[in-house]
Amino acid sequence: MKNLIIAKRYSKALFNLAEEGRMIEQYGEELDNFVRLLGKLPELADALRNPLFPEATRKAIFAAVAEQLALTPIVRSFINLLIVKKRVEHLESIAQYYHRLIDEYSNVARAQVKAAIDLDEKVIQEIAKTLEKMTGKKIVVEFQKDPSLIGGVLAQIGDFVLDGSVKRQLLNFKETLKRGALG
């Protein structure tokens, strides 16, 4: 919970700066590049997080990396602030929440769509169009094959779930039978 609060606070601050400077996408890409680098080089992540290293050393290490990544001054200052405040371990969550803010700003919703079989791109586009009509937002579909659904489709956008799977229908039928047998 604390991680989410921190991620929201810091990502909103960076997003507000990005919005003022019309750099929303740029800052998001820079955050992603840095997070990916930390994932590839865990020793770098450890060095930036480790309070045993003096703050000046951690900042110098970051400055060299920032130079190589050609980070903008705002993103450099932002990550330096995370180093000073000992919040580098939250950077991945901050980047994820930052992308949620981009989606909200751009009126985009991400839909997780699951089906028992692989779906044609055309079918996925039709599902996206239907969801766009329902939500009034541009839908980005993230498809996943899930044989446990038996058949049909399950679509989820945030907390909103449309479950048209055979699995759900069978579970509903089972509940109906239980109620009928008991009632």
Curated annotation (Swiss-Prot):
Belongs to the ATPase delta chain family. The keyword Secreted does not apply. It is found in: Cell inner membrane. It is a peripheral membrane protein. Keywords: ATP synthesis, Cell inner membrane, Cell membrane, CF(1), Hydrogen ion transport, Ion transport, Membrane, Transport. PANTHER family: ATP SYNTHASE DELTA CHAIN. It comes from Syntrophobacter fumaroxidans (strain DSM 10017 / MPOB). NCBIfam families: ATP_synt_delta. This is ATP synthase subunit delta. One of its GO terms (molecular function) is proton-transporting ATP synthase activity, rotational mechanism. F(1)F(0) ATP synthase produces ATP from ADP in the presence of a proton or sodium gradient. F-type ATPases consist of two structural domains, F(1) containing the extramembraneous catalytic core and F(0) containing the membrane proton channel, linked together by a central stalk and a peripheral stalk. During catalysis, ATP synthesis in the catalytic domain of F(1) is coupled via a rotary mechanism of the central stalk subunits to proton translocation. This protein is part of the stalk that links CF(0) to CF(1). It either transmits conformational changes from CF(0) to CF(1) or is implicated in proton conduction. It comes from the Bacteria. F-type ATPases have 2 components, F(1) - the catalytic core - and F(0) - the membrane proton channel. F(1) has five subunits: alpha(3), beta(3), gamma(1), delta(1), epsilon(1). F(0) has three main subunits: a(1), b(2) and c(10-14). The alpha and beta chains form an alternating ring which encloses part of the gamma chain. F(1) is attached to F(0) by a central stalk formed by the gamma and epsilon chains, while a peripheral stalk is formed by the delta and b chains. Pfam families: OSCP. GO terms for cellular component: plasma membrane; proton-transporting ATP synthase complex. InterPro entries: ATP_synth_OSCP/delta_N_sf (IPR026015), ATPase_OSCP/dsu (IPR000711). HAMAP family: ATP_synth_delta_bact.
